[in-house]
Amino acid sequence: MKTVSQLIDMKQKQTKISMVTAYDFPSAKQVEAAGIDMILVGDSLGMTVLGYESTVQVTLADMIHHGRAVRRGAPNTFVVVDMPIGAVGISMTQDLNHALKLYQETNANAIKAEGAHITPFIEKATAIGIPVVAHLGLTPQSVGVMGYKLQGATKEAAEQLILDAKNVEKAGAVALVLEAIPNDLAEEISKHLTIPVIGIGAGKGTDGQVLVYHDMLNYGIEHKAKFVKQFADFSVGVDGLKQYDQEVKSGAFPSEEYTYKKKIMNEVNNND
C-alpha cells in the first residue's frame, strides 16, 4: 500500500500517479489487481451506483457503507473516501465529528473534501490526525451554483485557483484533486505545490490522473464527459444477459454440464 510519503516521492521523481474510483467489493478488487496506486470512493456513487440525479442526495451513511466495502476489496491500496454534501460547513465541531466517523469507520487512508472555503477544516482535521485530500476547480457538490463547465477560465479565476491551491496545501492537505480546468493552469499549480496534484479533465501536466470506474469501462452510463477515455466496454454484459434469457426460455440452460449428476428420486420412491 502506498503511503502519503511515497506518493510525494512519486511526484518528486515525476512518476505519474494513477487513481480510479471504486464503490463496492468487486470493483475494488479489480482496481487493486490492476495495480492502480489510489482508489477514490467518490460521492459520484450517487449517480453511478445508486441512481440519484446528482451527488446532492448522497449521505454520510452511504459513503461509510461503500467505503467499508471498498476497503474489504482493496486492503492493500491507498483509499480516499469523499465527505458528502452537508458533512462539512455546518460547524467545526460537527464537521470534525463527521470526518472522524468517516475516517474511522471506513478505515480509509484519507478523506476528501471539496472547495476553497474548507481550509480551516483541513487545518483542524489534520491537527487531530485525519489526512485530507482537497478538491478544487469543478466541485460536483456545487454544480447547482456553478454548473458543469470549465473552471479557472479567466485571468481572475485562474489566479484565485492558484492561491486556493497554495492555501489548502498550507492548511495541511496531503493531496489535491483538480477538476475541469485548463491544462496549463493545472500544470502551473502542480509545479507550485509539493503535494501530489491529481487531475480529472485537467490535462496531462498534473502529477496523476483519476477517472470514474463506470465511465472509463462504459459500465451502465449514458453520458461521458469530454475528458473520459473508454478503456474497456462492460456494456457487452448486456449481450450475455440476453443470451441467458433466451436459453432459459428455450430450455437450453441449464444443460447437463451445469446440472448435478446425483440421482435421488429412486431412493425416495423405494421408501414408499
UniProtKB/Swiss-Prot annotation:
The active site is at E179 (proton acceptor). Its EC number is 2.1.2.11. It comes from Staphylococcus aureus (strain MRSA252). It comes from the Bacteria. Its cofactor is Mg(2+). Transmembrane segments: none annotated. 3-methyl-2-oxobutanoate binds at D43, S44, D82, K112. The keyword Metal-binding applies. Keywords: Cytoplasm, Magnesium, Metal-binding, Pantothenate biosynthesis, Transferase. Mg(2+) binds at D43, D82, E114. It catalyses: 3-methyl-2-oxobutanoate + (6R)-5,10-methylene-5,6,7,8-tetrahydrofolate + H2O = 2-dehydropantoate + (6S)-5,6,7,8-tetrahydrofolate. Homodecamer; pentamer of dimers. HAMAP family: PanB. It is found in: Cytoplasm. GO terms for cellular component: cytoplasm. Binds 1 Mg(2+) ion per subunit. GO terms for molecular function: 3-methyl-2-oxobutanoate hydroxymethyltransferase activity; magnesium ion binding. Pfam families: Pantoate_transf (PF02548). GO terms for biological process: pantothenate biosynthetic process. Pathway: Cofactor biosynthesis; (R)-pantothenate biosynthesis; (R)-pantoate from 3-methyl-2-oxobutanoate: step 1/2. Belongs to the PanB family. This is 3-methyl-2-oxobutanoate hydroxymethyltransferase. The gene is panB. InterPro entries: Pantoate_hydroxy_MeTrfase, Pyrv/PenolPyrv_kinase-like_dom, Pyrv_kinase-like_dom_sf. Catalyzes the reversible reaction in which hydroxymethyl group from 5,10-methylenetetrahydrofolate is transferred onto alpha-ketoisovalerate to form ketopantoate.
